[in-house]
Design a protein with these regions (language model features):
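Alpha/beta-hydrolase superfamily serine-hydrolase fold, recognizing
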Residues: 25-335
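Bacterial Sec-dependent N-terminal signal peptides
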Residues: 1-27
Length: 335
């Protein structure tokens, strides 16, 4: 029977773009290489109770292989009056390069561990940029808003001083993985309110936790689908929030999707993965940006884990990620 209800037709038409997005990311089949990665490392889930019982040092310092790179390609500096540690990678040893300010992941608990340095060096080479990696303070020793304060203060300092290290301060990109993506979202809001948001030409949000409220974790489809078994678990997300911001998850600087106004924020590249509890946060945040007139490009990687964990540098997924970032930089840094 035909339905000519105009309100129903409009509702369905309005939902079609979102339904289409939900159907684009894979078929619930884990990439064989990623399945092999989980087998090789002997991955096992930990419950929230087990995480709480573990010595925090075991979670703070993940065992990431130390891959060599030329030490002359990095400078170790401290910035602002708070002496925030920053690593500066310029393997091209050139001037007037784009500036990437990188904020690492780790659930607001892990510092910038040495095992991440090789990938940061590779980023500087891949994107022909100067990469500033910020070692912001982490929980539980330093709870919210310490990480946001350090991240924003570092951005301000780098935006004024990047040329001393070969960077072009007119070509600034903020890039964050997981907790780092959350910090990037907070920084862009602070910068906009301070009248310096236009200094940021692009934000790259990989594995963004946009909504850290418990009720969201209990109702989001991606949290329900990927609660366990895929490296980043719902229990880990809960533990990170209760360690970092146990009572502040309604604050827009903890759950950036709760911000009152998204207009005037920098263009965004938002990357998600099929087997990530936080997968749905990306499209939800992208919808907020798009509705406010912000240019957004989204990509969900089918068959992959949170932040493409386990995908080797030579993998198709990593090559595609690098290409996405290069194209976004080309689009927004040339203006």
């Amino acid at each position: 029977m035909r339905n000519d209800n105009p309100l129903l037709i409009l509702l369905i038409a309005g939902l079609l773009p979102f339904l289409g997005k939900a159907q684009k990311c894979g078929t619930r089949t884990l990439d064989p290489e990623i399945a092999g990665f989980l087998r090789i490392i002997g991955y096992q889930d930990l419950s929230l109770e087990q995480l709480r019982a573990m010595p925090i040092g075991q979670l703070k310092f993940p065992q990431i292989p130390l891959l060599p790179y030329p030490k002359e390609d990095v400078q170790r500096i401290k910035v602002t009056r708070d002496s925030i540690p920053v690593l500066v990678f310029n393997p091209l040893h050139k001037d007037n390069l784009p500036v990437i300010i990188h904020y690492h992941g780790g659930g607001f608990i892990s510092p910038l561990v040495p095992g991440l340095e090789y990938s940061l060096w590779q980023d500087a080479r891949n994107y022909e940029a100067v990469v500033f990696a910020v070692d912001y303070r982490v929980a539980p020793e330093h709870r919210f808003p310490a990480a946001v304060d350090d991240s924003y203060a570092s951005f301000q300092w780098i935006a004024e001083n990047a040329q001393r290290f070969g960077g072009d301060v007119n070509k600034i990109v903020l890039m964050g993985n997981s907790a780092g993506a959350n910090l990037v979202a907070a920084i862009t809001q602070r910068a906009k309110k301070a009248g310096i948001g236009n200094r940021i030409k692009l934000q790259v949000l990989n594995g963004l936790p946009a909504d850290l409220r418990p009720q969201h974790m209990e109702s989001s489809e991606s949290y329900l689908q990927n609660a366990s078994g895929y490296f980043q678990t719902k229990a880990l997300c809960y533990f990170a929030v209760e360690t970092y911001a146990p009572e502040q998850y309604n604050d827009p600087e903890v759950s950036p999707i709760l911000a009152a106004d998204f207009s005037g924020l920098p263009p965004a590249l938002i990357v998600t993965a099929e087997f990530d509890p936080m997968r749905d946060d990306g499209p939800l945040y992208a919808a907020k940006l798009s509705a406010a007139g912000v240019k957004v490009r989204e990509k969900c990687f089918a068959g992959q884990l949170h932040c493409l964990i386990g995908a080797l540098p030579e993998s198709k997924a990593q090559h595609e990620f690098v290409t996405l970032v290069k194209n976004a930089m080309s689009d927004h840094l040339s203006k």
